[in-house]
Every structure is written in C-alpha cells, then in structure tokens.
Amino acid sequence: MITYSYDGKYILTANEGEPATDYLADPLGTVSIISVKDNYTVTTLDFSGFASQQTALQAKGLRVFGPNASFATNMEPEYITISPDSRTAWVTLQENNAIAKIDIRSKSVTHIFPLGFKDYNLNGNAIDPSDKDNTILQKKVKVKGMYQPDAIAMLEQWGKPLLFTANEGDVREWSAFAENKRIKDLALDPTVFPDAATLKLDENLGRLNVTSTLGNPDNDADYDQLYSFGARSFSVWNGLNGQLVYDSKNELETKTKAIAAGVYDDGRSDDKGVEPEGITLGYVGKRMIAFVGMERADLVAIYDVSDPYHPAFIKTLVTGDAPEGLLFIPAKYSPTNKSLLVVSSENDGTVKVYQTN
C-alpha cells in the first residue's frame, strides 16, 4: 500500500516482502517513509529491533512461522493508516496477526501489538464452518479465529486514536510451505476433543481450514487447539496499547444471511466466510459512518460508529463482484456537494460511486 500524511510532508509505503514460492528468497518486510520536503529522501524501517521480544509477543498472539523463520523477514506489512496530526502511522501485519505503530517524525517502529484470538465457542461468535452442510448454519465451535486484519482506518475520538480493522485473514500457501489443513486431516487430542470423529465429518468441522502452525504446544502427535484464518468481522482497537475496544462478532455474516438473501456464499464457509477486506470512515452529516467491504459476499456493510464503543448496524449495500478497495469522499470535497463512497471490485473490474443521502 501507498499513502500520504495529512500535512503532505510524507509518503508511506508498506513493503510486504513475501517469500519466493520455494522460500529460497524471503525479503524483509518493511515500511518506507518518503520525505517530500527533503527531495523525496527514503527511510526504510524493518522490524528486526523487536526480535528480542519474539517469545513475549508470540505469547500474546503474534505469529512467526515458516521455513527458517526469522523475525524480520517474517513480518509482512499490509495496510497503513495515519493520524490527523501526521505524527503516527499504524500498519497491519496481516499474516502475523498484529498491528505495528510507527513514529513518523523520528522514523522508528515504536510498538508491535499482537491481536490475540477470537473464541468461536462464545455466544455471539458462532460461525458456519462447513461448505458441505447444504445450509447456512451458524454454531458455536471449539475453534479460535486469528484476526489477521487487512485494511485499517483511524478515528480520533475523545482524544484517543481508535483503529478500525477489516479482519479478512490470510494463509501462507506456497510450493515449499503451506500452513493450511482441513480439520478432518488433523489428529485431535482425545481429552480436549472426545467427540473428534463426529467433529471431523464434512457437515461439522471437517472441512474448516485451520493453521498447522498453532495449537500443538506440547509438540506431540495431536492438536489441543484449532485456529482458523480471519475473524469474519471488523474490530476497533485502542491505538495507544492495541487493546480490543469492539468486535462485530458474527453480525456481518448474520446480516448478510438475513438481509441479502442468496448473497452469502456458503462455498466459503470452510475458509474465511464473508472475508471483510476493506474499511473506510467518514462523516455523513453529523454521523461518523464506517463502510466495511466483504469480498466474498459482494456487499458493503454500513455502520454508525459515532460511538465507536457501540457501533450500530445501518444496512448492507450490494456492490460489484468482490469489493476490494473503499474510498470515502467527504461532502466538502465532492463534486456533488454530498459525500461519496467509491468501491472498486476486483472480480468484475468495476469502480462504482455511491452518493449518500
């Protein structure tokens, strides 16, 4: 991703640094800060300074994994958001299940916030884990979701930076290494999963893709915990400490199923569900609105986030095939004098512009 600071002094790029498919090359994941006023001088930041904290960060949910995994090459920056005062940037590390905080003026990475995991066995978090059950059936399951946010947007509210993330999820799947496994292909701990044979049926958990890199802390022959990709939600995080402020739980999929009949793609239930991918914020009148693009549902969910601790669902908007990028244009910059939402959809190659009322 490439973006710029509000004061126009800096351009920032997220340089993901994905490995070659054979892992013979795995470049550093970095963020570049380009100083416009200094003749476009480039300062590139990596994450090697946090290598000594790897164990502590992993205990909180950071992921470092893969062939010959080193901390700095493992970090994969994805999307960036910048504070209105142009002093701070936050970067999603999607595969690593974390957000990094950057001081723009000192050109340094100051924090990495691991995001932890979402428990699908709690009320309100139920998911449909199967694409072979001939229905859309949400149920509580003994699985945890890795948030793994893709897009990120920032809102300053009551003097506090709040980070909105679209928790799409992502898989490392290359010719030399693939982390994803279906639950039916894993050995499950008989004490934790006494009903493993039933759980492994295709219509239950058998088809659900999970990571093989987590869930076996004792390194024996079976898995004690299961972790799937993404959280099928959008979340709000405290930008100062990375603490979770709000999560939409399973509301995106519940609303998709209830309001947009025939839109929910049950064929994606075994992967990442509706795959919230894009998110943008903006004032419509006096209300702060969040727009959440769901790639696999071909929808944008619209929320009133004037109180970001208690977002309120408004409606879903049917878009093109696989909405990818979302851009909000405030009314004062709009040629129609009304706020606009621009949605780019990757599968049908369209860009659509919606005018708010």
Question: Which residues does each PLM region occupy?
Answer:
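Beta-sheet-rich non-transmembrane sensory/scaffold domains
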Residues: 1-357
